[in-house]
Amino acid sequence: MVVDSSALNVENDWKPERTLVLLGRTGNGKSATGNSILGKTMFQSKARGKFITKECKLHKSKLPNGLTINVIDTPGLFSASSTTDFTIREIVRCLLLAKGGIDAVLLVFSLRNRLTEEEQSTLRTLKILFGSQIVDYIIVVFTNEDALECGETLDDYLEDCPEFQEILEECDDRKVLFDNSYNAPVSKKDRQVHDLLNLVEQISKKNNGKSYMADLSHELRENEATIKEKQKQIEEMKGWSSKQEISQMKKELEKSHNEMLEGIKEKISNQLKESLEDVKEQLAKAQAEREETEKKMNEIQKLSSDEIRRLREQLNKAEKETASLRTELNKKCTVL
């Protein structure tokens, strides 16, 4: 059974579960990957981009072994077109959806698309926003297996992609290849999900079973427990309190709950704003350094071109002089 959840519905679920967050550029196949993991089409996904994820959404599925898989799909959070307010709002929404903490961050890349500058900076951005330990929870997911040459493996493809090698090195080479096409064999899709969940369990063991953002999860659960206790007290008062009093208490409780959530969102937002300023500053600095390097390389190339042109002109001049001397010499030989 697959159910949906809202961003502000924080429930205490005793059953074992794993929460996975999909991150990546729009068009890389995040939603399709989420559907493959869930085993059902829950996230809207169209190759032509008719349906684009505009906000974080969560769907869940229970495996035969009883494990609940929560999958959070996100819009393109770190694209150049995303505003700071949009990025902060959706990150907060994502964190509230991940009520029990995040067990793995799935960084999704498409083998069909060229790696953009924003994608190359994704790890740096994540580390600035959430701390360097975030890399301990990242799994790199490659989509569009059909983009590989006949007989070519993912490792073969990556040999010629140093930018991907750098990302994988930071993530302990945790990677998986997904074929999200409709005609992919069920056995193949099952194997992909199995390989992914094995990596999730490796991450769990490496981090001693602690989910990422567990502190936020603990705060949410504590506040939720307080709310539930007050709800219980209100129910017990129904026998000797008027309907008007009960209604007023429920309104006050709802207000308290909303204020609690707003307080948490504001705290996260303030932290993210400061971090995003650092991200922008560092990315701008890196961009300036890259442009300066390119400028110097162009100058060197221009100097080299000018030097080659000068040498070529000297060579042509020397050849002409040699030809002229040879002509004069031939004339003298003829006279003699």
UniProtKB/Swiss-Prot annotation:
Region (G3): 73-76
Induction: Down-regulated by aphid infection, 2-aminoethoxyvinylglycine (AVG), high CO(2), isoxaben, and propiconazole treatments. Up-regulated by brassinolides.
Sites where the protein binds GTP: G24, R25, T26, G27, N28, G29, K30, S31, A32, S45, N180
Presence of the UniProt keyword Coiled coil in the record: yes
Entry-linked Pfam families: AIG1
PROSITE patterns in the record: G_AIG1
Claim: GTP-binding is one of the keywords in the record: yes
Alphabetized UniProt keyword annotations: Coiled coil, GTP-binding, Nucleotide-binding
Sequence segments annotated as region (G1): 24-31
Region span, G4: 143-146
Region of interest (G5), residue spans: 179-181
Region: G2, residue numbers: 51-55
Gene Ontology molecular functions: GTP binding
Domain AIG1-type G stretches: 15-221
InterPro entries: G_AIG1, GIMA/IAN/Toc, P-loop_NTPase
Coiled-coil positions: 265-328
Tissue specificity comment: Expressed in pollen grains.
Sequence similarity: Belongs to the TRAFAC class TrmE-Era-EngA-EngB-Septin-like GTPase superfamily. AIG1/Toc34/Toc159-like paraseptin GTPase family. IAN subfamily.
Name assigned to this protein: Immune-associated nucleotide-binding protein 13
Organism whose genome encodes this protein: Arabidopsis thaliana (Mouse-ear cress)
Gene name as annotated: IAN13
